[in-house]
Swiss-Prot record:
It is found in: Cytoplasm. The lineage of its organism: Bacteria, Bacillati, Bacillota, Bacilli, Bacillales. This is Homoserine kinase. GO terms for biological process: threonine biosynthetic process. It catalyses: L-homoserine + ATP = O-phospho-L-homoserine + ADP + H(+). It comes from the Bacteria. The gene is thrB.
Length: 297
């Protein structure tokens, strides 16, 4: 019998101009199952050999930072979230680690505390808040203070186009400018403001328009994801609301009318054969914990 299992959804961040602020939880998942107590941490997984199987694993190292006195366990980790593709794989691991510490250490963390801790680890709230809360989130980090608002977007469908190539977040951030001209910042901020207002009022056509008018990061990352303009053009012709980079890339994130998501995904798959086209849904639940028997502490 499984004593404890944790499920964390993937996420997409930015949604165009909502840079490091807007996130959406997606229906791809990281699962952590606690097996038994051990004399040292062991992580069972079938990922690449570069992913640690001891206390250096991101899930375990996060848990131990949150609760340094945590006893070691054997855990099993499975996931269908692609690594280093802009779908929040590291954020999901951080969120899983915080919940692992919360459960095994009996910390009784509130949701707000989990979001605060996760944001401190990740450096921005968009991915982690989406994975914790589910749905669409808008967040801000000001010094050490995190503010997050969650909204529902059940009328939306999601398509992700995932390339075979990885793109490290640090590499993707390295192409961004160190200094942003004031007039460009004003323009970019205004577009982001309209995006958020449109999300709240469910004006999906406006959401799609604003998604495609980012000034903060996409113009600088186009050299790393050259297919974005052609994917954006085709998606719009097929009936999508809007297309943007998923997080730092290289995956592409498309919002569609919910009832058209399958049709649009099939059309895109016929055109962009070198990419994996995934018809997804917005996860509205966020992190879930399943306890089937008491854990020996």
């Amino acid at each position: 019998m499984i004593p404890l299992s944790i499920r964390v959804p993937a996420s997409t961040a930015n949604v165009g101009p909502g840079f490091d602020s807007v996130g959406i939880a997606l229906s791809l998942y990281l699962h952590v199952v606690v097996k038994e107590k051990s004399n040292k941490w062991q992580v069972i997984h079938s990922f690449d050999e570069s992913i640690p199987t001891d206390d250096k694993n991101l899930i375990v190292s996060t848990a131990c930072k949150v609760s340094p006195s945590l006893s070691p366990y054997i855990i099993e980790v499975t996931s269908n979230i692609p690594l280093t593709r802009g779908l929040g794989s590291s954020a999901s691991a951080i969120v899983a680690g915080i919940e692992l510490a919360n459960q095994l250490g009996n910390l009784n963390l509130t949701t707000d505390q989990k979001v605060q801790i996760a944001t401190n680890f990740e450096g921005h709230p968009d991915n982690v808040a989406a994975s914790i809360l589910g749905g669409t989130v808008i967040g801000a980090l000001d010094g050490k203070n995190v503010s997050v608002v969650r909204i529902e977007s059940k009328e939306l469908g999601v398509i992700s186009l995932i390339p075979n190539e990885e793109l490290n977040t640090d590499e993707s951030r390295s192409v961004l400018p160190d200094v942003f001209p004031f007039h460009e910042a004003v323009k970019a901020s205004a577009i982001s403001n309209v995006l958020v207002a449109a999300l709240c009022q469910k004006k999906w056509e406006v959401v799609g328009e604003m998604m495609e008018r980012d000034h903060f990061h996409e113009p600088y990352r186009l050299e790393l994801v050259p297919l974005l303009p052609s994917i954006r053009k085709c998606a719009k012709e097929f009936g999508a609301y809007g297309t943007a980079l998923s997080g730092a890339g290289p995956s592409i994130f498309i919002l569609t009318p919910y009832e058209k998501r399958q049709e649009i995904a099939e059309q895109l798959a016929r055109v962009f054969t070198s990419m994996k086209v995934c018809e997804l849904e917005i996860d509205h639940t966020g992190i879930t914990v399943n306890k089937e028997e008491r854990i020996e502490l």
